[in-house]
Curated annotation (Swiss-Prot):
The protein's assembly and partners: Monomer.
Region (Interaction with DNA): 169-170, 246-250, 323-330, 354-357, 383-390
Protein name per Swiss-Prot or TrEMBL: Transcription termination factor 1, mitochondrial
Molecular function terms, GO-annotated: double-stranded DNA binding
Entry similarity comment: Belongs to the mTERF family.
Domain notes: Contains nine structural repeats of about 35 residues, where each repeat contains three helices. The repeats form a left-handed superhelical assembly with a solenoid structure that wraps itself around DNA.
Keyword Transit peptide set for record: yes
Length: 398
């Protein structure tokens, strides 16, 4: 066996060894043991060893020709005991398994103390394994900040169960605290912030400057359209479209698209974007334009006028979100069942229903003796309970 040097140690080739990197030193140890009874080292004192090894995360390579290397056996054992789906976690964030310092047990105890079940905790870690890298202090501080918005621990647990990323994505608690203070300062209510936290948590991970930029832009946009209360305008827009705080360029482009396409004056545009058309502001401008062009082309082919097309879209702005093929297929489905385009124009929400729902309901109504050409087709988009109650009444008179 060759002698050891401070820069590098050379040993006879073998399959099983650990490689530990440290400043100015490289040791090779056999048999996957670190400082264990069967490992060997050069004759350095423990004091010298630990002086040369910095206490940061380091990688451990376990070479084995028979199986995939395991990065941290204690971590794997802990996660398996907790019921974590290891395969899912590895696929989502493999880097976590390279860490030698993790806090899965602390995370488990913390979430249990907040009312989370073991199953929920396992699900959270399976889907967002980076959660186990957060320290107890960081978790506690972040939880306290969330409680300034969310009224109970159980509500937070429910949010984490649906979207673990919302809580664990960032560990910058100062940025979170500053964003909460700012959003409260511009007049957003606790209820509004709770909806943002639940549905658009990245708002709170944005830089404070980005959020300020968007809110200031919205206030200016509201004033330019004649709204006399900028704070109220911001509240209305954010409540209608919770993913809005992302791009001022996108919002500007979509405001101009709505204004020019539908020939709206400032008052009409204000009513639209504070109401049913608010979500269009957050849509890709290219997508919005392509979607409208397809709607226009399809309805023109069925004999509709420009005025009818605009009336249709303005009364049901959500139609812009439908993919081109899906919109065309739904129109064709209804037309094939002798429902006229004028009926669809007058009752655009029938397009909320899936094609399978439309077909099954149309069949049931025909069997009940209904004349679809004279029927108010809005019931095609009703809730299941309401629709079935109406169908039952219609069947009695058949």
């Amino acid at each position: 066996m060759q002698s050891l040097s401070l820069g590098q140690t050379s040993i006879s080739k073998g399959l099983n060894y650990l490689t530990i990197m440290a400043p100015g030193n490289l040791w090779h140890m056999r048999n996957n043991f670190l400082f264990g009874s069967r490992c060997w080292m050069t004759r350095f004192s423990a004091e010298n060893i630990f002086k040369s090894v910095s206490f940061r995360l380091f990688g451990v390579k376990c070479h084995n020709t028979d199986s995939e290397p395991l990065k941290n056996e204690d971590l794997l054992k802990n996660l398996l005991t907790m019921g974590v789906d290891i395969d899912m976690a590895r696929k989502r964030q493999p880097g976590v398994f390279h860490r030698m310092i993790t806090n899965e047990q602390d995370l488990k105890m913390f979430l249990l103390s907040k009312g989370a079940s073991k199953e929920v905790i396992a699900s959270i870690i399976s889907r967002y394994p980076r959660a186990i890298t957060r320290t107890p202090e960081n978790l506690s501080k972040r939880w306290d900040l969330w409680r300034k918005i969310v009224t109970s621990d159980l509500e937070i647990v429910n949010i984490l169960e649906r979207s673990p990323e919302s809580f664990f994505r960032s560990n910058n608690n100062l940025n979170l605290e500053n964003n909460i203070k700012f959003l409260y300062s511009v007049g957003l209510t606790r209820k509004c912030l709770c909806r943002l936290l639940t549905n658009a948590p990245r708002t709170f991970s944005n830089s404070l400057d980005l959020n300020k930029q968007m809110v200031e832009f919205l206030q200016a946009a509201g004033l330019s359209l004649g709204h006399n209360d900028p704070a109220d305008f911001v509240r209305k827009i954010i409540l209608k479209t919770l993913y809005l705080i992302q791009s001022t360029k996108r919002v500007k482009a979509n405001i101009e698209f709505l204004r020019s396409t539908f020939n709206l004056n400032s008052e009409e545009l204000l009513v639209l974007i504070c109401g049913p058309g608010a979500e269009i502001l957050d849509l890709s401008n290219d997508y919005a334009r392509r979607s409208y062009a397809n709607i226009k082309e399809k309805l023109f082919s069925l004999g509709c006028t420009e005025e009818e097309v605009q009336k249709f879209v303005l009364s049901y702005p959500d139609v812009i979100f439908l993919a081109e093929k899906k919109f065309n297929d739904k129109i064709d489905c209804l037309m094939e069942e002798n429902i006229s385009i004028s009926q669809i124009i007058e009752n655009p929400r029938v397009l909320d229903s899936s094609i399978s729902t439309l077909k099954s309901r149309i069949k049931e109504l025909v069997n009940a003796g209904c004349n679809l050409s004279t029927l108010n087709i809005t019931l095609l988009s009703w809730s299941k309970k309401r629709y079935e109650a109406k169908l039952k009444k219609l069947s009695r008179f058949a």
